[in-house]
Each structure stands twice: as C-alpha cells, then as structure tokens.
C-alpha cells in the first residue's frame, strides 16, 4: 500500500464524520400554528413562553395591524389567495431582515430550516414593533407577501411583470428618485423584476419608502406598471 494513502484515507474518514456530525447537530424548533387575521402564522414556541409573553402579545398585535391593512383594501377573493401563503415568525433568528424563501436549496445550503420554503419569514419578532421599521417600511409584510404571491400564484416568469420591468429600465425613470428620508437615490425596484413587483405593490396598496410612494404617483410615474397592478390586485377606489 502506498505510504501516503493511509494518512489521506484517515483525513477523508475524519472529514466524513465531522460533516455527518454537523448535519446531525442541525436542530430546529417545531413551530406552533396560530391564526392571525385568517393567515396561518408558524410561531417560534419561545414567543409563547411566559418570559416573552409581553413581547409576543405586542408582536401579534402589530402583525394583525399589517394584515388588516391588506385585508380591508383588497377584494375578498384576493385576500383569500393571500391567506393561503404562510408566515413564519421567529423570536431571534440569525437571519435579520424580513424575507420570502422561494427555494429549499438555498435554505439547506445556508443551514436554515428547510420547512421555511414558500414561507414569508419574520426572523426577529422585535422588528414588528421597531420604530425605524414603521418609519421606513410600514408595508414590509405586504412587500414579502407580494413576493410569495408573485411566486406561488402569478409565477416569477409572468411576462407582463417582466415586460413592465424592462420598459421602466429602458426609460430610466427609477434611476434617481426621492427616498422617504428626502434624499435622491437609485430605486430598489431596479434590483430585479421581483423587487419591482413587490415595491409597486407597496405603492399601489399602501405607502412605499421610494418614489412613487402612493397609488396616484405610481399611475403618473409608471403607467405601464400601474396597469399591471390593477390587473393583479383589482381597482382600488
């Protein structure tokens, strides 16, 4: 046997055991399902413990506020579709920002619970009652639900949304816009057509942190996307 082979074999075996041990050590809590305004919320059980009772109550109240503002402006059939999209609420996750998880592969590659696939995720409950979050992103939950709706109901390959995105890029109308702070910046919607749809949804149904801030401004500034919004969400009067 080659004298170099045994040390190499030992390294391979040790590495295999380490990787197996690492995978075995990945343990995730089993969430508790709660109903908030008709949505299924997969709740970190720590939020329901007595030590976190006050925080949990405040967060559920804030989340209900977010969902009510969606529920009362949309047609009932749209609300029913959105209520099929689950939300995961964690006490303190190593992820920071609220987000939507479209793919299991990314979750597993980054050592997150694969059960978060196709969920809107609120990694840190305190974000729901944070003053800065309310000042900057008063419709952040709607934004993430819009991603879920885009993926699961419309499809990320929706041609009308992609066409509107390409149109606005070609016109350069989002290159320098007003931010909620008063500064002029490049619009976050330019990131990709998915963010464009979610940002436009915020403006159409609520208030966005980038111009166009409101439905009327979206209609004036980006009429093609405004028409997409009317088609997707229905007229708002």
Regions found by a protein language model. Give the residues of each.
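Acidic/His-rich structured neighborhood in mature extracellular/periplasmic domains
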Residues: 57-170, 213, 225-226
